[in-house]
């Protein structure tokens, strides 16, 4: 079940966009944002360009709630275009944008996203078997996003599908030297 025992996150999204309800609605203590998985098969391509999605960003921004984005890599540019329309929206890109190869289109899209002041990147969700890829990814992410907009996330237990919790954590710890900002403070 989702929040308030709703059967779908889309119902909560509709409620959040209902302006007459939104002003009187209280979210449970500890809720700081909303996540809509945009990378799964049931999410239509181009979803983050839909008017309803942009309206959702507007409502979240007005309520000072963040949006956690879990996108397909080839739709990161779409995400940039939607966030540009709601510059006050706070957005966290999950899993470094779900990247598995560092190609030019990924780098271009992530560079554009990093240029927006309210976009953050969760350092999580990448395979760790190729150490050269990991180093190149972390070099790119840390060189593209301001240090204050990077945060660690374990992605546990899903991390076990492509790595191990320990290996993933150790890669990030070694690269960032146990930086308290990335492991704690930036998420606050």
Predicted features, each with a name:
Residues 1-74, 81, 115, 122-128:
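Active-site gating/metal-coordination segments in enzymes
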Residues 31-38, 90-96, 119, 123, ...:
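Non-cysteine beta-strand/loop elements that form the S-adenosyl-L-methionine
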Residues 41-46, 98-101, 127-131, 158-161:
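Short, small-residue-enriched loops and turns at beta-alpha junctions
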Residues 60, 95, 121, 141, ...:
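Conserved, mostly hydrophobic/aromatic
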Residues 79-80, 102-107, 131-138, 160-172:
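Histidine/acidic-residue-rich catalytic or RNA/ligand-binding cores of hydrolases
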Residues 87, 92-119:
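Histidine/lysine/aspartate-rich catalytic loop segments that bind and position anionic ligands
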Residues 107-143, 150:
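Aromatic-anchored helix/helix-loop segment that forms the rim or "lid"
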Residues 140, 144-151, 160-188:
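Mid-to-C-terminal alpha-helical segments outside catalytic/metal-binding sites
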């Amino acid at each position: 079940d989702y929040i308030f025992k709703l059967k779908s996150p889309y119902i909560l999204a509709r409620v959040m966009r209902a302006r007459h309800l939104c002003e009187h609605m209280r979210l449970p203590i500890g809720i700081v944002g909303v996540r809509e998985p945009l990378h799964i098969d049931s999410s239509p391509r181009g979803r983050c360009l839909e008017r309803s999605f942009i309206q959702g960003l507007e409502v979240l921004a007005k309520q000072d709630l963040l949006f956690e984005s879990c996108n397909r890599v080839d739709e990161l540019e779409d995400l940039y275009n939607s966030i540009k329309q709601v510059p006050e929206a706070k957005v966290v890109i999950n899993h470094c944008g779900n990247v598995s190869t560092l190609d030019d289109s990924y780098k271009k899209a992530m560079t554009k996203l990093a240029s927006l002041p309210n976009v953050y990147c969760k350092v999580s969700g990448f395979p760790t078997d190729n150490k050269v890829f990991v180093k190149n990814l972390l070099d790119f992410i840390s060189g593209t996003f301001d240090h204050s907009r990077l945060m660690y996330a374990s992605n546990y237990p899903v991390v076990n599908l492509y790595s191990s919790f320990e290996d993933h954590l150790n890669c990030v710890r070694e690269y960032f030297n146990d930086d308290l900002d990335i492991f704690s403070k930036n998420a606050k």
